[in-house]
């Protein structure tokens, strides 16, 4: 099984390396291609970091613990990396794309803005099965994230993911703790776990602030179940027409 590992936190992310090791240890043929710099919040954007989409810089990297696994630092956002992989830029096009492990949850309809999820959705448009993996690390948490917990939960889905129809996408969120049970299937919350507020400063700029949302979460939604300490998995669909809309 040819597998691409990517993310939006960048090629140096420990979460990326942990996910790559998990996929390799599962017996999959793994290649890692991730942004040379952090590209969080880029959605499925097809943007090259240098602004020239005709040429994208790619640098081979060596990562401890991933001997024998090709690792590429790519001057591009994760959506473009997934597209490049589908076109054979890093070897045979992947049958499976794993995106993550993201430092922080990706829940609710706010996944639209996630580079982690955006890479998975882009890959699905090109026939790959994709899994986005995120660890629910609080923004102010200074302890070491439990990457191994996320890998263990994700690995429990690997075989099921591989058996899904081409183009399938799963979004997995895992609580940041030493152990977690298998994920519960969940619907998308109306919003993510973070709400953005804007304020006109009067000096020609707009001030942005982020606030964690913990109240009024829809029961059974991914954000609500994750807040209760459960891992969640949500099946996503990429861009599709709406034939029922009357206009």
Can you name each region flagged by the protein language model?
Residues 124-149:
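Glycine-rich phosphate/pyrophosphate-binding loops
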């Amino acid at each position: 099984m040819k597998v691409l590992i990517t993310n939006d936190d960048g090629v140096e992310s420990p979460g990326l390396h942990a996910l790559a090791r998990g996929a390799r240890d599962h017996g999959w043929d793994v290649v890692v291609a991730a942004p040379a710099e952090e590209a969080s919040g880029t959605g499925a954007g097809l943007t090259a970091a240098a602004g020239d989409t005709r040429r994208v810089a790619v640098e081979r990297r060596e990562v401890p613990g991933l001997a024998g696994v090709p690792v590429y630092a790519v001057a591009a956002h994760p959506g473009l990396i997934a597209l490049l992989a589908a076109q054979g830029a890093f070897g045979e096009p992947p049958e499976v794309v794993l995106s993550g492990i993201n430092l922080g949850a990706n829940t609710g309809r706010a996944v639209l803005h996630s580079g982690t999820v955006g890479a998975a959705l882009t890959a699905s448009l090109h026939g790959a099965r994709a899994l986005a993996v995120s660890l629910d690390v609080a923004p102010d948490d200074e302890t070491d994230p439990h990457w191994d917990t996320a890998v263990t939960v994700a690995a429990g889905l690997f075989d099921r993911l591989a058996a899904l129809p081409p183009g399938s996408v799963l979004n997995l969120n895992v609580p940041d703790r030493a152990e977690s049970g298998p994920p519960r299937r969940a619907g998308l919350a109306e919003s993510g776990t973070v709400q953005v507020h804007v304020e006109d400063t009067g000096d020609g700029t707009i001030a942005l602030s982020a606030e964690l949302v913990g109240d009024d979460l829809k029961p059974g939604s991914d954000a609500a179940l994750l807040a209760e300490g459960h891992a969640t998995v949500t099946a996503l669909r990429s861009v599709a027409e709406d034939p029922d809309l009357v206009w």
